[in-house]
């Protein structure tokens, strides 16, 4: 009898401890969605004659004559913490040039977006031309939030389509230090901060600035890894879009920074923490002396106080050579040291220099672009102004298409 009483008390104590301790959060498991699988991205008005082209059996929308692919995905609504990874793979389907690319998500809280604009149901809000000129859609407006970039990338010169060893264009362009041309290029980024825009249902897409009917083929995967801890509650975050100058649809090359700073207002609610700014930027203008090839300082301010002051620049572009079979090549003469039969010697040699090797404004042909992240430790609740300044940016001049692709958003924890 005594043993039964002791057992009952032990069981009751265990139940009491369990009730008072952390609640075990039910697991939903890891999740992977293959959004696109070798899907063409191209300028094909004969195939996609409208700004909006309805999806077929693959559920993929083709916007702006095929230069945007868009699809609705559904992710589980997790209760445990998650790690979210995005993978994008690109190969040329015949376009040999380097092109700007953007993988993006349409903000659910925005009543106006790229999809319903393409359908003709909505249009970008009007802008104050004294501040934004004709640059519609780059900052928030009535019932509108800018498109949020999941990943910025740049296509290489002709990877895939021109990668065969016997390709007539490229077979003699491979430098001695490359054993083969790659068939595609892939990038992975941690996009956990952007999970609030994806959970439940969301429209995600890929834009490539191609003007050829061949274009590219693109694949995209979102992987969600759930925490294995029984009590690891999901960190509740909010994403606030601030700016996006990528010219997705009915927009123009953004050379506005050559003439003025660009500002937009936002509001920080009370009680939030760990407020961070994500800033993505690339400079363009592929002619000699263009903004693509000249270092230009970027200054980012909030309420007139600098939070980021830097020169966005990549000097490692030669490391992407194997992804650029169709790049233009020049011969550069230099004095080279080498090992001769009787020891070290020197002589003049001509070495190939690929266009893809040249340093650029925060990108290389075949690279992705990582966001700059700034922790805003002292920001207070209330209204604020976000400003981007590129003082030495150059205007478009005929076919000298200088412009800067800038996107920015805030992330905070609730």
For the regions a protein language model found, what residue spans apply to each?
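Extracellular/secretory-pathway and virion-surface proteins
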Residues: 20-414
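Bacterial Sec-dependent N-terminal signal peptides
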Residues: 1-28
């Amino acid at each position: 009898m005594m043993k039964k009483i002791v057992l009952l008390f032990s069981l009751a104590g265990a139940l009491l401890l369990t009730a008072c301790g952390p609640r075990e959060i039910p697991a939903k498991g890891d999740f992977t969605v293959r959004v696109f699988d070798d899907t063409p991205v191209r300028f094909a008005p004969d195939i996609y004659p409208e700004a909006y082209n309805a999806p077929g059996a693959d559920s993929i929308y083709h916007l702006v004559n095929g230069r945007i692919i868009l699809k609705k995905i559904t992710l589980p609504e997790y209760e445990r913490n998650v790690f979210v990874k995005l993978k994008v793979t690109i190969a040329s389907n015949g376009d040999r040039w380097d092109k700007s690319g953007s993988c993006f998500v349409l903000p659910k809280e925005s009543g106006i977006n790229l999809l319903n604009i393409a359908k003709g149901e909505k249009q970008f809000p009007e802008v104050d031309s004294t501040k934004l000129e004709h640059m519609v859609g780059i900052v928030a407006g009535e019932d509108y939030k800018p498109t949020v970039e999941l990943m910025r990338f740049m296509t290489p010169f002709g990877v895939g389509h021109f990668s065969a060893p016997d390709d007539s264009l490229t077979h003699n362009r491979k430098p001695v230090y490359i054993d083969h041309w790659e068939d595609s290029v892939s990038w992975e980024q941690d996009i956990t901060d952007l999970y609030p825009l994806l959970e439940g249902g969301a429209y995600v897409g890929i834009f490539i600035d191609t003007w050829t009917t061949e274009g590219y083929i693109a694949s995209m995967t979102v992987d969600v890894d759930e925490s294995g801890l029984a009590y690891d509650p999901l960190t509740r975050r909010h994403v606030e879009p601030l700016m996006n100058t990528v010219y997705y649809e009915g927009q123009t090359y953004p050379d506005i920074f050559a003439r003025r700073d660009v500002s937009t207002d936002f509001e920080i609610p009370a009680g939030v923490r760990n407020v961070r700014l994500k800033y993505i930027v690339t400079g363009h203008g592929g002619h000699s002396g263009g903004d693509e090839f000249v270092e230009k300082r970027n200054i980012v301010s909030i309420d007139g106080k600098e939070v980021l002051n830097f020169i966005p620049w990549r000097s490692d572009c030669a490391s992407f050579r194997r992804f650029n079979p169709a790049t233009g090549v020049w011969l550069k003469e230099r004095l080279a040291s080498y090992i001769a039969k009787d020891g070290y010697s020197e002589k003049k040699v001509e070495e190939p220099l690929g266009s893809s090797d040249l340093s650029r404004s925060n990108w290389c042909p075949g690279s992705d672009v990582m966001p700059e992240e700034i922790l805003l430790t002292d920001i207070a609740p209330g209204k604020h102004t976000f400003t981007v300044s590129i003082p030495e940016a150059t205007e478009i001049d005929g076919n000298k298409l200088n412009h800067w692709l800038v996107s920015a958003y805030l992330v905070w924890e609730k």
